[in-house]
Amino acid sequence: MVSILSNIGMMVVTFKRPSLFTSLRRRSANNIIITKHSHPISTTRRSGNYKPTMWDFQFIQSLHNPYEGDKYMKRLNKLKKEVKKMMMTVEGSHDEELEKLELIDNLERLGVSYHFKDEIMQIMRSINININIAPPDSLYTTALKFRLLRQHGFHISQDILNDFKDENGNLKQSICKDTKDILNSSKDEHDNLKQSTCNNTKGLLKLYEASFLSIENESFLRNTTKSTLAHLMRYVDQNRCGEEDNMIVELVVHALELPRHWMVPRLETRWYISIYERMSNANPLLLELAKLDFNIVQATHQQDLRILSRWWKNTGLAEKLPFSRDILVENMFWAVGALFEPQHSYFRRLITKVIVFISIIDDIYDVYGTLDELELFTLAIQRWDTKAMEQLPDYMKVCYLALINIINEVAYEVLKNHDINVLPYLTKSWADLCKSYLQEAKWYHNGYKPNLEEYMDNARISIGVPMVLVHSLFLVTNQITKEALDSLTNYPDIIRWSATIFRLNDDLGTSSDELKRGDVSKSIQCYMNEKGASEEEAIEHIEFLIQETWEAMNTAQSKNSPLSETFIEVAKNITKASHFMYLHSDVKSSISKILFEPIIISNVAFALK
C-alpha cells in the first residue's frame, strides 16, 4: 500500500508481486522508505521470512537410489523387448482396434510410452488411415480414438463424434441422462447401477477428457465439457456401483480434479501406477515395466539434483543473498515437469540454473530492492556488460555477475553444439523480464490500476515463462532454423499462450489475504475494477480465459510450426505444471513422491535372480 507521510516528506512504499515459480507464497509486505525525489533516506529491508528448505545440501547429497545399478537396467531392457513383441502382435490385428487404443493409453499413463514412440506412431497412423472405413464404435472407443489421434498430431475432425449428437448439435440426452433417470431406471436387482450405466460413464469420462483437446470454433466439444462434467459429478455423488466400479469413481474424481490434458505427466504416472495395479485386467508385464522405469528415472533425477546441489553450494549465493528463498528442489521440479525422460538431464540441469536466478531476481524486485536499485539493475541487465556493475549495490553485483556467467554458459553450449550465437536472444528475454518487473513496481508505486488487457500485456512477460521457454528452445532443439529464430522477436503464439495460462493460474492461486497484505492487483482485481464485477464473476471469467487460451494453444499446435516437437512439448508441460503448482495444496508431498520416494516392487528381487 502507499501512504503519504506529509509531515516528513516521505512515502512508505509496499510492493509485492508474484512471478514464475513462486509456489511458496509470500506472507508479508515490503516496506521501502524513500523520499519524494526517490533518493533513499533510510531503508528498512527485510528477509521474506522464508522457512529453511526441508531438502538441504546434506539431505540431497545423502540420497542413495539402488535403481542406478546395471542389473535393473538389464531387467528394464528385457521388459521393453517383451512389450515391443506384444505391440507387434497387437499391431498385426485388424479386428481389435480398442485393444490397440487402450494399450497406447496405458503406456502413456504409466509413463513408459517414450520407450515405444515409433511403435505407437505406427499404430496410430494405421488407425488414422482406416478411420473412414471403420464400423461405428461405442462412445468409449470413439472418444478415446479422437483424443489419442489429436494428442499425436493427427488432424482429426470433431465430426467423428457426430453419431453422439442430437439434431441441435448437442450431446444426445440418451447418453447423458439426468439424475432422476439414473436413479429410477438404471438400477439392477441389487439396487446398484446397472453395468450398462457404469460403462456409459466410462464413455462419458473419455469424452470429457477428449473435450479438452478442442481447438478454436469447436462449440460442440466446448459444450460437451459442460454436459459431461454435470453427469460425472452426479455419478460421483451417487457412488452406488459395486466394488469393481469404485475404480471408476476414483478415475472420475481424479479427472474432475484436473483434466488429463492439463495434468503434469510425471504426477499422472505416479498416481496411475497405484490405480492400474488394482485393476482386474492389469497386464503384469506393463505394471512391472512402469514401476521399474519410474524408479530408474527417479534415480536419474536424483543424480541431476546432487549435481545441482553442489553447484548451488559452490556459488555461495545462499550466504550472500540471505533474503532470497532456498528452493532448489522446487525449482528443479519445474524442469522435471517440463521433460522427465532420463536422456534430458542436460536440459534439466541448465534450465534449473536459469529458474534459480528467476527466483533470486524475483526476490530482489519483490522483497529487498529499493525502487532506485531496481531501476539501476534493470538498466544493467539491458546493457549486459560487467562494467554496468559499477553503479549497483554490492548484493546486486554478486547476483548480476553470477547471472551473466550462467547465461553465457548456456550461450556457449548452444554455440558449441549448433554454431549459432544465441546470446542476443537470451539477454533480450532477461531484459524483457526485468523491464516487466520494474513496470509493475512503478504501477504500484504510482497507485496506477491497469485494465485487464494492459495488465496481461505486461504480466505474461513478468510471469517468466517467455524467458524460460526461449532458453528451453535452444537447449532441446537439434536443428535451430532461421525461421525459429525470427519467431522469437515478438514471441511465437505457443509461448504467449503458455505464459497467459501460467499467469492466470498464478493469479487464481493468489489469496485475498495476500492482497490485503500488499500484493499488487491481479487479473481478477483488474477485471473487477474494469467491469464492476463481483469476485465470483471475475474468477469465472478468468477460468473461461484459461480454457479459451488452451483452445488457442491446441490450435497453434495443430498448425505447421518452425519450432521443434520437443520444444512444443516443453511449452505444454510447463503450462500443465502451473495448474498443479499454483492450485493444489500438497505440492511438497507430490515433489517427494516424484523425486525421493521409489515405488515398491514386490517381485523385482525374484525377477533379477
From Swiss-Prot:
Keywords: Chloroplast, Lyase, Magnesium, Manganese, Metal-binding, Plastid, Transit peptide. Residues 1-42 form a transit peptide. GO terms for cellular component: chloroplast. Binds 3 Mg(2+) or Mn(2+) ions per subunit. Mg(2+) 3 binds at D506, T510, E514. Its EC number is 4.2.3.26. GO terms for molecular function: magnesium ion binding; R-linalool synthase activity; terpene synthase activity. Belongs to the terpene synthase family. Tpsb subfamily. This is (R)-linalool synthase TPS5, chloroplastic. It comes from Solanum lycopersicum (Tomato). The gene is TPS5.
